[in-house]
Design a protein with these regions (language model features):
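N-terminal secretory/targeting leader peptides
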Residues: 1-52, 60-273
């Protein structure tokens, strides 16, 4: 990201031919199609990656993503997961109410809406700028990744608090290419690339799970305090999040179908009545 184009330009760069493909979060394109955000992340929704991955590959999620990208002449090869995010913070945020007035980095889309609903002000910046923004006090907390991902970015050098489990995000990333580039591949190679992308995802999930456990030792050495919200707060945040689902469903016809699909699968899982 940033080596050729900025993260907000990656999507349009496929059309101009600057790039043939990219690996990023669909939510960054929610201004072009709101469904990208609710495909990418479902705050207050799934409890683990397996539930989300099953929605993508067994309940039609990948078809929604491909439909959204087809509008631009692109093909979504597959989804890549990494795990449930936590939130590094420079100040102690011990409850939902403590989010009020805080400056938080959050991506465009439904996650930013959730932060706003909790009373925070949000800033959308690429990951490469988060450390500097934390260090200079531009933001006080950040949405970014799992414990080890945040630690590798150096965030816990300036953040002495970590909100865990994360209440806000367990997103998917996408590997998307231009349809023209995809069509040049023989069918057997296309199949190989799709299968390899699924393998890439689960290799990432298991590696990061191991690294998250190892990062706990490093956080202790850095003097980072792990904070968990009261369970009642997590329940309230889930209620707020689910209200946002309906708000997002009204943004486009595709968004409505995506939300309906999430709800149907969540009911099958017993996550919703």
């Amino acid at each position: 990201v940033g080596a050729i184009v900025g993260y907000k330009e990656m999507h349009s760069s496929l059309k101009t031919g600057v790039l043939q493909g990219y690996y990023s979060a669909p939510t960054f394109q929610s201004g072009k199609e709101p469904a990208f955000s609710i495909i990418c992340d479902l705050p207050g929704g799934y409890e683990n990656v397996m539930q989300f991955d099953t929605w993508v590959y067994q309940k039609g999620g990948i078809d929604f993503l491909r439909e959204a990208q087809a509008k631009f002449g692109y093909y979504a090869v597959g989804a890549i997961f990494y795990g449930r995010e936590v939130m590094p913070a420079k100040v102690a945020i011990r409850s939902m109410n403590d989010m009020k007035g805080k400056k938080v980095r959050a991506p465009e889309g439904i996650i930013a809406k959730l932060m706003t609903a909790l009373g925070a002000s949000t800033v959308s910046i690429p990951g490469s700028e988060v450390y500097s923004a934390l260090d200079k006090g531009v933001i006080q907390a950040t949405d970014w990744g799992t414990r080890s991902m945040n630690n590798q970015m150096g965030f816990y050098e300036v953040c002495k608090y970590s909100i865990e489990p994360g209440f806000h995000s367990m997103s998917l990333l996408e590997f998307t290419v231009s349809q023209k580039a995809w069509d040049k591949l023989p069918p057997d190679v296309q199949q190989i690339v799709e299968v390899a992308t699924r393998a890439w995802s689960w290799a990432a999930v298991t590696r990061i799970m191991k690294e998250d456990a190892e990062a706990g030792v490093q956080l202790n050495k850095l003097g980072v305090e792990v904070i968990s919200f009261p369970e009642e707060d997590y329940k309230k945040i889930r209620e707020i999040s689910r209200g946002l689902w309906e708000e997002w469903a009204a943004k486009s016809e595709l968004s409505k179908r995506v939300v309906d699909s999430h709800i149907a699968w969540s009911k099958e899982l017993g996550l919703l009545d």
